[in-house]
């Protein structure tokens, strides 16, 4: 399963080349939600796009991002103060009478202090690094869809919750960030041929076994060209009227170079000339949808151990 991916940096520039418009209203709604719910995870590279955007809607998004960063910094600074005090207390205790409990408290406090310092330094840096574009299940990413005949970029959660299911579906089916091709007319029949999307990514990541250990491999096209990964998406509405936009990346049997690493699935990059047809499927002609998946981009995937 594709458990993680790296979205295209400067994604707003890339998607503009596809003719898609950014749904600022949906992004503004998401960033407002993050202020109230810290579990909402958005890659920093997505935030960065709005530092370059213009207009009132983009300004409201920047304001929400700045507010969130201030809240996050305050939370970490308060926790850093607490851990420094814990470290000082443990060191005083060790000086008077060494105990395993005090030594363990000092060790834990030291680890947390290092982690918090790293997080604060990360929050304050200005440039982007590769990991700023990574998404994981439950994170939000920019996804291209077609609505009312126009391509739009909307932020969606990388774990699909189909319309009509209860909210606890996410816990009962935690693997719904991927949609197996051989299940498209089974589990995914409500979305396949109806609600298609593409996600612009640079590379993807997979868990593989190496002896008794699990390692993460990073796969990227040898030509370093971005991919438009085939996805399914859903607009879920809860009993209280709340809305969730979410998606799953379609996976298929891997090419030989991916299979040789020990992994049995791979994402499907759509050819640019098929994007419009993919985003506007005919539910009565699933054969055409499968034909697009078959006539995919077939780059050679290089791999390395993920950092």
Q: What annotation goes with each model-predicted range?
A:
Residues 1-307:
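Short linear sequence motif anchored by a di-proline
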């Amino acid at each position: 399963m594709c458990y993680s991916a790296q979205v295209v940096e400067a994604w707003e520039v890339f998607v503009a080349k596809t003719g898609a418009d950014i749904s600022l209203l949906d992004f503004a709604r998401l960033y407002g939600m993050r202020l109230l719910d810290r579990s909402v995870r958005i890659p920093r590279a997505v935030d960065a796009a709005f530092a370059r955007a213009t207009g009132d809607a983009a300004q409201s998004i920047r304001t929400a991002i700045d507010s969130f960063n201030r809240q996050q910094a305050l939370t970490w600074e308060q926790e850093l103060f607490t851990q420094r005090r814990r470290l000082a207390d443990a060191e005083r205790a060790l000086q008077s009478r060494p105990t395993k409990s005090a030594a363990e408290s000092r060790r834990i406090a030291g680890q947390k202090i290092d982690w918090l310092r790293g997080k604060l330094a990360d929050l304050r840096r200005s440039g982007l690094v590769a990991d700023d574009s990574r998404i994981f299940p439950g994170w939000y990413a920019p996804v291209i869809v077609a609505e009312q005949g126009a391509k739009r970029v909307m932020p969606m959660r990388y774990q699909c919750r189909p319309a009509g299911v209860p909210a606890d579906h996410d816990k009962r089916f935690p693997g719904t960030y991927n949609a197996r091709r051989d299940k498209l007319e089974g589990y995914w029949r409500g979305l396949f041929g109806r609600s298609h999307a593409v996600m612009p990514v640079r590379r993807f990541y997979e868990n593989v076994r190496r002896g008794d250990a699990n390692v993460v491999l990073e796969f990227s096209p040898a030509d370093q060209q971005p991919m438009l990964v085939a996805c399914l998406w859903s607009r879920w509405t809860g009993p209280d009227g709340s809305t969730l936009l979410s998606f799953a990346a379609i996976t298929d049997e891997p090419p030989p170079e991916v299979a040789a690493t020990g992994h049995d699935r791979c994402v499907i990059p759509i050819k640019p000339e098929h994007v419009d047809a993919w985003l506007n499927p005919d539910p009565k002609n699933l054969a055409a949808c499968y034909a697009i998946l078959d006539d995919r981009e077939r780059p050679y995937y290089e791999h390395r151990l993920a950092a």
